[in-house]
A protein has these predicted regions:
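Surface-exposed, beta-sheet-biased, low-hydrophobicity segments with strongly acidic/polar composition
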Residues: 1-117, 124
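Short helix-capping/linker turns of helical repeat alpha-solenoids
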Residues: 135-137, 150-151, 171-174, 187-188, ...
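Hydrophobic face of amphipathic alpha-helices that form TPR/SEL1-like repeat modules
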Residues: 143-150, 179-188, 217-226, 256, ...
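TPR/TPR-like (Sel1-like) alpha-helical repeat modules
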Residues: 308-315, 416-431
Length: 475
């Protein structure tokens, strides 16, 4: 869990001096133990504009401040939502308020849920990471592993994540079994091989131990059905509705799963109703779902509105907004439009990348390499972004980097690197790279992955050459 310890008030100002345009910040801190209902907050305010701020209420979840007849809440659990919906008129002050908090390692569902998604993990601060590193608790091992695996902050983060997950699993952390199962799906373990049998073994053990992360992932798999699970959206719907009706502390992202199930059952109105409820309860994944439903209705205004709301709430996926803008439309604008769009795109994609969104790395890499959308051509930046996208498991980054390096690959080692990037692209979901993967395999560039390729990536047996057992479709 995370517990808040201090209220911080920052007042930004600059002197009333025509010759001085510098902005300054006055910071005042209040200890949680000193805050109580009715307390008047005294703080440095050179402008004298904000007086009479009182504490309305204090709880472990945050606090509510009053200013005249207006109320302002700071929610520790879901920062983008007010603390309650009791008809209160929450209004933002024109100053910066935030809670300083510290992560508390606990063997509780609430603690583990903080590390289920990239958006949640992206909220971790340096002090949080140091606290996790200093802890020997199995729960901290799992949490630190998720930070490494979902954000890939270091070159060996994948190996570190696996080590931490195995340590946590040995100590009995159910969610660690689920985390390891997901690594086998993408070939991210030390074996460097996609292995669905191992994935299922670890997943089933996680489910048997009561892992909510495993239940969440398995429910999502069963909505559409795949190699990992049967297609049964009606069963998922019933399971999640029961969960929402009977559990008192529900993880908000279950609303997104229920909405997905209704969408798969061709009930878009019900799906939208559930997604809206999810937003109200703190789900971040419901924002892009509502945005895409608006796009399907060709309602661009509502689409943009939901994407912008998602960004404000901290949904990393929403930062790809306008990522599909083509060069022709960009060039049709005037210079002011181009400068504005180019700057906004770069800032937006950088923010998404900091939240672990590999697709943002792809956009940054693509435009840095091609010089499109007003980006300056910079191959060094392009390679840096694309390699980050590869580390984050983005199939488009893998494919583009392979395309770029293929034209420059002269040595056997360089050609093998390109082939491995193609394999990663296919592992991460880019099916249209499978033809080239097959050719790389026939050329002997992927012999060490023979078992995986023949089991998962080649067609039926009648397409295999009897002499060498390889795919003969391109002979």
């Amino acid at each position: 869990m995370r517990q808040w310890t201090r209220l911080i008030i920052d007042v930004d100002y600059h002197p009333c001096d025509p010759g001085n345009s510098t902005w300054y910040c006055e910071r005042t801190a209040f200890s949680k133990s000193d805050l109580c209902a009715g307390k008047v907050l005294s703080y440095e305010d050179p402008g004298g504009l904000f007086g009479g701020i009182r504490v309305d209420s204090v709880s472990e979840d945050g606090l509510v401040l009053s200013y005249g007849t207006k109320l302002y809440s700071i929610n520790m659990k879901h920062p983008h939502l007010p603390l309650d919906k009791g008809g209160r008129d929450y209004t933002e002050f024109e100053l910066n308020l935030f809670l300083e908090s510290a992560i508390v390692v606990e063997d509780t569902p609430a603690f583990y849920r903080q590390f289920y998604t990239r958006d949640q993990v992206a909220r971790l601060r340096g002090s949080d990471i140091r606290a996790l590193e200093a802890s020997d608790a199995p729960a901290a091992r799992f949490a630190l592993g998720r930070w490494h695996y979902l954000l890939m902050p270091e070159e060996d983060s994948c190996a570190q994540a696996e080590k931490l997950f195995r340590e946590a699993a040995e100590a009995g952390v159910a969610d660690a079994f689920s985390a390891l199962s997901m690594m086998y799906v993408y070939g991210d373990t030390r074996e460097d091989r996609l292995d669905l049998d191992e994935m299922v073994r670890w997943r089933d053990e996680a489910l048997a131990r009561g892992s909510e992360l495993a239940a969440y992932r398995y429910a999502r798999n069963r909505i559409g059905g795949d190699l990992l699970a049967p297609k049964e959206p009606d069963v998922v719907r019933d399971e999640v509705e029961k969960r929402l009706a009977t559990e008192t502390d529900v993880w908000p992202e279950w609303y997104a799963v229920l909405g997905d199930a209704y969408a798969a059952l061709d009930k878009p109105e019900k799906a939208r109703e559930v997604y809206l409820a999810g937003v109200e309860h703190g789900s971040l994944r419901c924002y892009p779902e509502l945005a895409m439903m608006a796009r399907e209705r060709e309602d661009d205004k509502e689409y943009r509105s939901w994407m912008e709301k998602g960004m404000a709430a901290g949904c990393g996926w929403c930062f790809i907004l306008d990522g599909d803008l083509d060069e022709e439309r960009f060039q049709a604008g005037d210079s002011r439009f181009k400068n504005l769009v180019s700057r906004q795109f770069q800032e937006r994609f950088e923010q998404g990348l900091r939240r672990g969104q590999g697709l943002c790395a792809y956009y940054l890499g693509f435009h840095s390499f091609t010089g499109t959308l007003g980006f300056t051509i910079d191959e060094e930046d392009a390679f840096r972004y694309l390699r980050k996208g590869v580390a984050l498991g983005d199939c488009y980054s893998c494919s583009l980097l392979a395309d770029i390096l293929e034209d420059r690959a002269e040595t056997p080692a360089a050609k093998k690197e390109v082939a491995r990037l193609r394999l990663k692209a296919v592992r991460y979901g880019k099916d249209d790279d499978r033809e080239q993967l097959a050719q790389d395999y026939r050329d002997g560039l992927l012999d060490e992955y023979r078992d995986e390729i023949e089991e998962y990536w080649l067609p039926d047996d009648d397409d295999v050459d009897e002499d060498d057992g390889r795919w003969d479709a391109y002979a």
